Amino acid sequence: MAKSILFGEESRRAMQAGVDKLANAVKVTLGPKGRNVVLDKKFGAPLITNDGVTIAKEIELEDMYENMGAQLVKEVATKTNDVAGDGTTTATLLAQAIIREGLKNVTAGANPMLIRKGIKLAVDTAVEQIKKSSKQVDGKEDIARVAAISAADPEIGKLIADAMEKVGNEGVITVEESNTMATELEVVEGMQFDRGYLSPYMVTDAEKMEAVLENPYILLTDKKISNIQEILPILEQIVQQGKKLLIIAEDIEGEALATLVVNKLRGTFTCVAVKAPGFGDRRKEMLRDIAILTGGEVISEEVGRELKDVTLDMLGTAESVKISKENTTIVNGKGNKEVIADRVGQIRRQIEETSSEFDKEKLQERLAKLAGGVAVVKVGAATETELKERKLRIEDALAATKAAVEEGIVAGGGTAYLRAIKEVEKLTDDNAEVRLGIAIIRRALEEPVRQIAANAGLEGSVIIDKIKNSEDGIGFDALEGEYTNMMQKGIVDPAKVTRSALQNAASVASTFLTTECVVAEIPEKNPMPAAPGMGGMGMDGMY
């Protein structure tokens, strides 16, 4: 495959054109008066969104050099989304500003390596200032504010704050599409897994078609039970106690299942059987989680335990268990609190060590089931198009909220960046080109406020000047068109999002400035295949 090569200024300008095309498409969404972008889809209705990373991911440019520039800035948005879950538009905007200001200086003959040094120095100082000015999230009200600003909707803010309050910081909040027009919150208390009863004859409430067991014993095993003789000794002990039983096993079939059903129908004793959740190694870990939560043991040949030798003290217990056709929910397991805390710590360490996003997600689900709970935000809307747009906004707001809980909040609307300029201005260096790098960041830090103002139809320079000359904490509320104390008014951003956006933008932009040569593949021009000749329409053989 033949390659095309560009050098120096020509290569940087070609890539900058791509950066500008992507950033200009993304930055129209910034701020409370930001607009939406419509993305064409090959199948179905177009997607309308104001989510920076979703827009960036859709952009592929025809010109190969421009596309390389666009892909570099796309990485800024993607990385910020991965780390903080929000702030992708701000990150893209900052990258564009640093590249634009940096290229002016490189074109004028400045050394890009020294400029890069100045950029790093200024970014480190700004990040330190952002961390210093952050305030810990304090209660439900702060959480609602963060979510409302991210989603540009106070209702969504309240919904997410309710969810966080109910499941705690360790809980899992998922976002699903609803079949109705309303957006609702559904909270599952206790540990729930997606396995239901093995026979409908096991239900205790025929109207709701579910089984509810109060203070039951819980037998956990990774074995398949098909012979009733294996569990007969423990069943006799439970009948004598007058208790109910939940069996969680790999499977229960044949004679064993039939005997349990017959005894339930006769009223001898109540037993509900469900399959163990998960598969393979994950199933073993989930059974162990349930055992720790309920204070029981997993009966497994791996640890030398046989079903026929089970005693009552090996069984778990819980305040209540609800089993439907699809799900089992264990409420208030009677396990030892210290052992549960140790298990939670172990899972948390595994989350930190794993690099797989899928494994991380599954571990977080297990952590939530042990430590908090699970909340589901069911997103409703009148049309499919509105539903997708609303779902994306709620996912962003949720990510912003989690980031705020981790590292606290700072004044929103780009105010935190303007406040960081004061510290950056104090920096100095003997080398003039390093000072240029510092000046580039000083100018780039104004860009978010400038763009928020532009999207509101206002002149950014005037607003920036007014904020700089105001006391600390004062910023510009673009929605109301007034200067106000951002923290007091609840216009806040997560410190983690603000920090990550700047760090990722500077990382990619400073690398961009040191580019001297671009190598791209020349696309093949395949000639259209010649049309096949039309066959004769002979009438041979006809009389």
Swiss-Prot record:
An MF annotation (GO) of this entry: unfolded protein binding
Taxonomic superkingdom: Bacteria
Reaction catalysed by this enzyme: ATP + H2O + a folded polypeptide = ADP + phosphate + an unfolded polypeptide
Binding positions (ATP): T29, L30, G31, P32, D86, G87, T88, T89, T90, G413, D477, A478, L479, D493
GO cellular component: cytoplasm
Predominant location category: cytoplasm
CDD domains attached to this UniProt entry: GroEL
Keywords: ATP-binding, Chaperone, Cytoplasm, Isomerase, Nucleotide-binding
Alphabetized Pfam families for the sequence: Cpn60_TCP1
One GO-annotated biological process of the protein: protein refolding
Record's subcellular location: Cytoplasm
EC number in record: 5.6.1.7
SUPFAM superfamilies for the chain: GroEL apical domain-like, GroEL equatorial domain-like, GroEL-intermediate domain like
Family: Belongs to the chaperonin (HSP60) family.
Subunit structure and binding partners: Forms a cylinder of 14 subunits composed of two heptameric rings stacked back-to-back. Interacts with the co-chaperonin GroES.
Function summary: Together with its co-chaperonin GroES, plays an essential role in assisting protein folding. The GroEL-GroES system forms a nano-cage that allows encapsulation of the non-native substrate proteins and provides a physical environment optimized to promote and accelerate protein folding.
Family annotation (PANTHER family): 60 KDA HEAT SHOCK PROTEIN, MITOCHONDRIAL
Protein name: Chaperonin GroEL
Lineage, opening ranks: Bacteria, Bacillati, Bacillota, Clostridia, Eubacteriales
